[in-house]
Amino acid sequence: MAIDLLSTFIKPMHREGTKFVAIFAVVTLVLFLIWEPLGWIGVGLTVWCYYFFRDPVRVTPTREGLIVSPADGVVSLIEPAVPPAELGMGPAPMTRVSVFMSVFDCHVNRAPIGGTVTAVAYRPGKFLNASLDKASEDNERNALAIRLADGRQIAVVQIAGLVARRILCEVREGTPLLTGERFGMIRFGSRLDVYLPEGVQPLVCLGQVMTSGETVLADLTSPEARRTGAAR
């Protein structure tokens, strides 16, 4: 019973967080030597750092054609937009769904659908609030193009935010990905944009809470109309 209760709160940690937690822990020990109340503040910050870099197991739906959320967070934008030029996907607008991640969300990023990475392009930029529309164009970003089995393409863009200063991408051109497979993360608050293939409607609405690798964002085979309005 106790083990089950602990497993509810204690999740695996992404390896990217190991050095940060170690630094926080060492600083905490020093703070205890200086003044005990400061040490307890350090304990709280160390626990928060561990929590930020958590990497929980996700149960990804297996039905063919489903596109899942690449990130935990809230849907902040749904609009037509041209995918990043550096991906070479052409000038035609695609439906863009943006998922904003706060500093309290899990920041491990997952592939929205299975396919082969055909392009990876990093572009330096500003660090505006990631919830702003212009963050897609102005902020530091890392863009991926994924070719699906039927030849269509989808784009996924990692966007740095107001606090984030480090985008981690663990795939390169030619890497095969499974739906829900981990491909990177962004530290300390950020955003993920997904560009859907032509004719594919998002099955989410503004303000909807998303779980990476689990929440269905769209369905390549569904005739269902696009949802309107916002989450209530």
UniProtKB/Swiss-Prot annotation:
It is found in: Cell membrane. One of its GO terms (molecular function) is phosphatidylserine decarboxylase activity. Its main location: membrane. Its cofactor is pyruvate. The keyword Membrane applies. Is synthesized initially as an inactive proenzyme. Formation of the active enzyme involves a self-maturation process in which the active site pyruvoyl group is generated from an internal serine residue via an autocatalytic post-translational modification. Two non-identical subunits are generated from the proenzyme in this reaction, and the pyruvate is formed at the N-terminus of the alpha chain, which is derived from the carboxyl end of the proenzyme. The modification Pyruvic acid (Ser) is found at residue 190. HAMAP family: PS_decarb_PSD_A. Catalyzes the formation of phosphatidylethanolamine (PtdEtn) from phosphatidylserine (PtdSer). This is Phosphatidylserine decarboxylase proenzyme. The gene is psd.
